[in-house]
Amino acid sequence: MSFKCGIVGLPNVGKSTLFNALTSAGIQAENFPFCTIDPNTGIVNVPDKRLIQLKKIVNPEKVIPATVEFVDIAGLVSGASRGEGLGNKFLGHIRETQAIAHVVRCFENQKITHVNDKIDPLEDIEIIEMELILSDIETLEKAKESLNKKIKSGDKSIFLKLETIEKFLIGLAKGINARSIDCNEDDINLIKEFNLISLKPCLLYTSDAADDDHC
């Protein structure tokens, strides 16, 4: 069983460095924005002591552990949802993952550039969160437009989808990410097909050690 986790954040905050630490991939991590363009991927076995014990009991010919596929995704910038900094391409890479590891820079070092020329972790978090939310709004607006064209068919499922989409659009418009919007299990099941980025589980990782190479 494999699980896909995207490593995201602003440019030059330590995403590739974290990716290297997790995967031992040794990919390029340089002190300039957009060091990464095409996503890097690495698969890591998940340690599980239970698997070791089961192996001793069952003695199978082969043991296949669960794995996590980490994806080092190029940095997003303000305006990414409008295509800034190849944003649409990078957002598409995030959409293909099942979870997000959001890397935030928390260290001062004049030798390591910051895309906004200042260290403000809270603002950096808000920029990424807002770009994911804006991307989801665009996705749902397109879905809404498409469903409205089919509404004359009288299909009840279309009305349910439109109602759920509207609920999420209202929340997203307030700056609330999809995973924090108050909804029930039926809503989640209906909205899943649209693969909203801000609905994915998100882990916040702070990069607080200023090594010489962060990207």
Question: Where are the model-predicted features located?
Answer:
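C-terminal-of-GTPase-core extension/linker across diverse P-loop GTPases
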Residues: F3-V8, V13, F19, N148-L204
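G-domain G4 guanine-recognition motif of GTPases
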Residues: I73, R105-E108, L140, K152, ...
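Short gly/ser/thr-rich secondary-structure transition/capping motifs
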Residues: I52-L54, A80-G85, C183-I188
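Extended, highly charged alpha-helical segments
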Residues: L122, I127-K167
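Single conserved hydrophobic/aromatic residue that forms the stacking wall/gate
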Residues: Y205-C215
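Conserved G1/Walker A P-loop phosphate-binding module
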Residues: M1-V77, N88, I94, I100
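Conserved P-loop NTPase nucleotide-binding/switch module
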Residues: V71-G75, S81, G85-L132
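Conserved beta-strand/loop subsegment of P-loop NTPase cores
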Residues: A99-I100, T139, P201-L204
